[in-house]
Amino acid sequence: MRIDVITLFPEMFGVVRDLGVTGRAHAQGLWSLHAWNPRDFTTDVHRTVDDRPYGGGPGMVMMAAPLEAAVKAAQAARAAQHLPPAPVALLSPVGRRYDQGAAQQLASSDGLVLICGRYEGLDQRFIDRCVTLEISLGDFVLSGGEIAALAVIDAAVRLLPGALGDGDSALQDSFNDTLSGLLDSPHYTRPEVYEDQAVPAELLSGHHARIARWRRDQSLRLTLARRPELIDRARTQGWLSYADECVLAELQGVVAPPDPRKKRRRKPAA
């Protein structure tokens, strides 16, 4: 997977290239990062990449030409590696919400070109000509797209085969389909007792089925309390078992649903 980033601050991306899980994956050749500064594609002595907005208003707007030239250079470099043209994604508060599914889709692809905006915004003509999708992390505004781009990259790289030391680690992440799209359960490590708080007995039992049921119950409890819409989604997808539904009924103080495994007795004919 190759990631190209168009940014005024290429040095910010040393974090994902050199450190932690993403840094190790980069060193192993599981993915590559290439940063392109629009200032390198300007033609004036001041390397200007922004100007005042037409129609007035506060702030400055990033100019179309340097951005488009940077994108073309990135796509040409990809072509030189015999890679197909990549989607061009703009980090933007008006974009589609980036989630675990989008991260998995990116991890399964050849990569993309990320555009990190600054100032008041980007010239709309560049967006119309070059951008194929817009991505948002949520309903808030950052000073630039770099922090959002780092999150997009990190979420995808850790899903690459071999990126994590334990291949099953990503399968236990919150939102993963192996957890039925639910939130992850709490985690504990040594010491067994910390500030008078003990590790739950189920985790010390050594009984694998009991541990799995405890983790599933905690996942259901946490998801119901924090993200109830994920419960609805899991139910719609058919990802909840009868045991799950019984746990949820108990948590909500309602009567458990009938067991679908038990056939209803037919009334004798009169």
From Swiss-Prot:
The keyword Cytoplasm applies. One of its GO terms (cellular component) is cytosol. GO terms for biological process: tRNA N1-guanine methylation. GO terms for molecular function: tRNA (guanine(37)-N1)-methyltransferase activity. It is found in: Cytoplasm. It holds the Pfam family tRNA_m1G_MT. Homodimer. Its EC number is 2.1.1.228. Coiled coil: none annotated. Specifically methylates guanosine-37 in various tRNAs. S-adenosyl-L-methionine binds at G117, L137, G138, D139, F140, V141, L142. It comes from Bordetella avium (strain 197N). It catalyses: guanosine(37) in tRNA + S-adenosyl-L-methionine = N(1)-methylguanosine(37) in tRNA + S-adenosyl-L-homocysteine + H(+). CDD domains: TrmD-like. It is an enzyme of class 2 (transferase). This is tRNA (guanine-N(1)-)-methyltransferase. The keyword tRNA processing applies. Keywords: Cytoplasm, Methyltransferase, S-adenosyl-L-methionine, Transferase, tRNA processing.
